[in-house]
């Protein structure tokens, strides 16, 4: 027996439903203790739209789920066949029909669980912003509070914008954090 995580391809938009169906089959004992866990990995994303923050969930791998198996050396084909029979499951990733599935390595599993927040990471909430160059915005906070200008560049790594504001009748570039900007 070799306990490991595997990636299963599913119909897109059905990941949660398939996770629930497999979890139900686990609880009913259909897989005889071979299927240990199943996850449709999601991450929490902080999104700013129209100046309002909200946290939403986003699928890490749309169209895929993770399944933890303690796959025996003998009889594994029946287990795999039963998993593939679940409505919405397409196949295990990286294998042809009749082949033994290949598990993903521990580093990949760890990175997915860090994104989902199941393993502690520096920050498990990521920011999404919908700014565009040339867009008119208002600065809120800091020395340029309530100044309006046009976005001239966006630095997603540093989470900063360059905004061209009018100071003494001249266009002056000002660097501002994403959180200090609102759309007009």
Swiss-Prot record:
Coiled-coil stretches noted in the UniProt entry, renumbered to this chain: none
Example GO biological process: regulation of DNA-templated transcription elongation
SMART domains, alphabetized: KOW (SM00739), NGN (SM00738)
InterPro entries, per the entry: KOW, NGN, NGN-like_dom, NGN_dom_sf, NusG-like, Rib_uL2_dom2, Transcrpt_antiterm_NusG, Transcrpt_antiterm_NusG_bac_CS
Gene Ontology CC: cytosol
UniProt cross-references to NCBIfam families, sorted A to Z: nusG
The name this protein goes by in its record: Transcription termination/antitermination protein NusG
Organism, as annotated: Borreliella burgdorferi (strain ATCC 35210 / DSM 4680 / CIP 102532 / B31)
